Design a protein with these regions (language model features):
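Helicase motor core with emphasis on the C-terminal RecA-like subdomain
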Residues: 1-281, 285-286
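Accessory DNA-binding and partner-docking regions appended to nucleic-acid-acting proteins
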Residues: 211-217, 221-383, 388-503
Length: 503
C-alpha cells in the first residue's frame, strides 16, 4: 500500500533503480506490515533473507485509550495534560480544530501553538523551531507536523481526534520518548469523527468520467508524441483533486502510457529595478538590440511586463529559450525582478497504450480498490482501540513483530480498562424532502453552468461538504444544503441519495 496518494512518486523508484542500473538499495521504514514489506521487497528485487526487522515494541511508551464523549474532550484533555511533565504533541484531524484546541489550551495558561499545512512555510518553520528549542511546550497539529521531527524529550502524544489508520497512529505516538524515558500516548476516542477520516478517503477517489476526461485530454492535446500539462487546469476540468491527479499520472507512467521529459514555466513577468536605459547601457551590438526587442514586445501593466514570445519569434527569430536565459541573466545582475508561474510538465506519450479501451476503467478500478482498503484500515483501527488484550502486543504483531510481551503492563487494557467506542449522540439527518430539494437545487444550479449530468458522487460530496474542484469553480459551496450531512458517514449518505433520487 506504500506510496498511494501519500508519496505517489515513491512508486516510480523501482523503475528508476532499473533504469539507472543501481546495484544495491537500502529501504528503511518504521511502520511496514508483513504484506507491505513483501511488496516493497518484490518491487526492489530484495531477497527474503535480506529483510531485517529489529523489533517494533517500545517498553517506555504507555498506551491509553479513553472513551470520551465529544463534549467532555476539552476537560479530559486538560486533565490529561496536567498529569504530564515536559513537552508534547496534540494531534487533531482538521486545520480549524488545530487552531480551536490550541486557543482553548492557551486560555488555560499553557504554552501552546497550532500547526497545520494552511500556514505559510515561514510560520510553520518558526513554530517548529520554537518547539524544538523548548520555547513552546505543546504543539496542536494535524498530520502536517511530524515529518523530520526528531525531538528526543517529547513526554506525551495525545490524539484529540481519531488517527487515520494504525500506521498513522504508530508513526505519531512514535515521536514520543525517543530518549528512552517513560512517555504517555493517550487517545481521546469516540466514533463522532469516524465520518471525517473516512471522507478524506472518499473525496480522493476520482470518478470514471474524470479519468476518461484526462485520457481524452492527452489524446487531443498530444502533438508529435508530446503532451504538455498544467496540473491545476486539468484538475479543474476533470474534477480530480491535485493529489489524486498526481497519483493518476504516476499510474499512467507505471503502465508506460506517458513518460516525463522536462518541465518549464509557461508565464513570465518582470519589472525594472532601475530605468530601462540603465538596463541597456552595459550591453552593445546585437545583445543590446535583442534586449531592446524583448522590452518592445512585452505587454506592461503598470510596472510589470509579460514578454510576448510569439511576437518575439515573428519579428526577431529568437526562440523562447533565449528570451528566458536573457531575463534570468538580468535578474542575476539585479537589473530586473523576474517572476514565474504556471509550471508546465512535458511528457512523451505512447499512443498505442493510450488508446486501450480498458485503460480508464482499469485505472478507476485501481482507485476504488485503494478506497476500499483505506476504509478497511480505518475499521481495523477502531477494532484495535476496542481490543480486550494487550495493546502493545497487538500493535507489535500488526507490524510483524512476534517477540513483544503478551502483557506489557503499561497499556490501558493491561490495567483492566478496555473500552467500547460509541457516538456521543444520535446522528441527525435532514428529512428526505429537504435532501431532495437541495439536490434538485444543485442540479438546477449546475445546469446553468453547462453541467447537465450530476453524478451520484457529486451529490454525495455536496451533502457531506467535501471540497472538489467542481464546487470551487462553480461556487457550489454557497448553495443551501452544502455540508448538511457532514456529520454522517459517506456510505450511508450514498445509500440515502440512491433511494431519494431514484438512482
Amino acid at each position: 500500500e506504500w506510496g498511494h496518494n501519500f508519496r505517489p512518486d515513491y512508486l516510480k523508484l523501482p523503475n528508476y533503480r532499473k533504469e539507472l542500473n543501481i546495484p544495491l538499495v537500502l529501504l528503511l521504514t518504521a511502520t511496514a506490515t508483513k504484506k507491505v514489506k513483501k511488496d516493497m521487497a518484490a518491487k526492489f528485487s530484495i531477497l527474503p533473507e535480506h529483510i531485517v526487522q529489529t523489533g517494533f515494541y517500545r517498553q517506555n511508551l504507555d498506551l491509553s485509550i479513553l472513551a470520551v464523549p465529544t463534549k467532555a474532550k476539552n476537560q479530559q484533555l486538560i486533565e490529561s495534560i496536567n498529569e504530564q511533565s515536559g513537552c508534547g504533541i496534540v494531534y487533531v484531524t482538521l486545520q480549524q480544530s488545530a487552531e480551536y484546541v490550541a486557543n482553548f489550551l492557551s486560555q488555560q495558561g499553557l504554552s501552546v501553538q497550532p500547526y497545520h499545512a494552511g500556514f505559510m512555510s515561514e510560520k510553520r518553520q518558526e513554530i517548529q523551531e520554537d518547539f524544538m528549542s523548548g520555547k513552546v511546550q505543546i504543539i496542536v497539529a494535524t498530520i502536517a507536523f511530524g515529518m523530520g521531527i526528531d525531538k528526543a524529550n517529547i513526554r506525551f502524544v495525545i490524539h484529540y481526534d481519531l488517527p487515520k489508520s494504525i500506521e498513522n497512529y504508530s508513526q505519531e505516538i512514535g515521536r514520543a520518548g525517543r530518549d528512552s524515558l517513560p512517555s504517555n500516548c493517550i487517545t481521546l476516542a469516540n466514533l463522532d469523527g469516524l465520518n471525517t477520516v473516512e471522507n478524506f478517503v472518499f473525496g480522493d477517489t476520482p470518478e470514471l468520467s474524470g479519468i476518461d476526461l484526462v485520457i481524452k485530454n492527452i489524446q487531443q492535446e498530444c502533438q508529435n508524441h508530446k503532451w504538455e500539462l498544467q496540473g491545476l487546469s486539468l484538475s479543474n476540468a476533470s474534477n480530480i483533486r491535485q493529489l489524486p491527479m498526481r497519483t493518476l499520472l504516476v499510474q499512467l507512467e507505471l503502465q508506460g502510457v506517458i513518460k516525463p521529459l522536462f518541465s518549464y514555466f509557461a508565464d513570465f513577468k518582470y519589472k525594472f529595478t532601475t530605468t530601462k536605459d540603465e538596463v541597456l547601457d552595459p550591453f552593445e551590438g546585437e545583445r543590446k538590440e535583442f534586449l531592446a526587442t524583448i522590452f518592445k514586445y512585452s505587454g506592461f501593466k503598470k510596472v510589470w511586463g509579460e514578454p510576448d514570445f510569439d511576437a518575439l519569434f515573428q519579428h526577431y527569430g529568437c526562440d523562447r529559450g533565449r528570451v528566458i536565459v536573457a531575463l534570468e541573466y538580468l535578474q542575476e545582475k539585479q537589473l530586473i525582478t523576474l517572476e514565474t508561474k504556471k509550471i508546465t510538465e512535458v511528457y512523451s506519450v505512447n499512443k498505442t497504450l493510450l488508446s486501450s479501451p480498458t485503460l480508464a476503467r482499469s485505472l478507476h478500478e485501481y482507485f476504488v480498490d485503494k478506497e476500499e482498503k483505506e476504509i478497511k484500515r480505518i475499521a481495523t483501527l477502531v477494532r484495535f482501540f476496542e481490543l480486550d488484550t494487550c495493546l502493545s502486543h497487538n500493535l507489535s504483531r500488526y507490524f510483524d513483530d512476534q517477540n513483544a510481551p503478551v502483557n506489557c503492563g503499561h497499556c490501558s487494557v493491561c490495567r483492566g480498562k478496555e473500552v467500547k467506542l460509541n457516538y456521543s449522540q444520535d446522528v441527525i439527518w435532514p428529512d428526505d424532502i429537504r435532501i431532495f430539494e437541495v439536490l434538485t437545487s444543485l442540479i438546477e444550479h449546475m445546469s446553468t453552468k453547462n453541467k447537465s449530468v450530476i453524478s451520484l458522487e457529486t451529490m454525495c460530496r455536496f451533502l457531506t461538504g467535501l471540497t472538489v474542484p467542481l464546487f470551487s469553480r462553480n461556487k457550489v459551496k454557497q448553495l443551501a444544503g452544502f455540508g448538511s450531512c457532514e456529520n454522517i458517514r459517506y456510505q450511508e449518505v450514498r445509500e440515502k441519495v440512491i433511494r431519494i433520487m431514484n438512482l
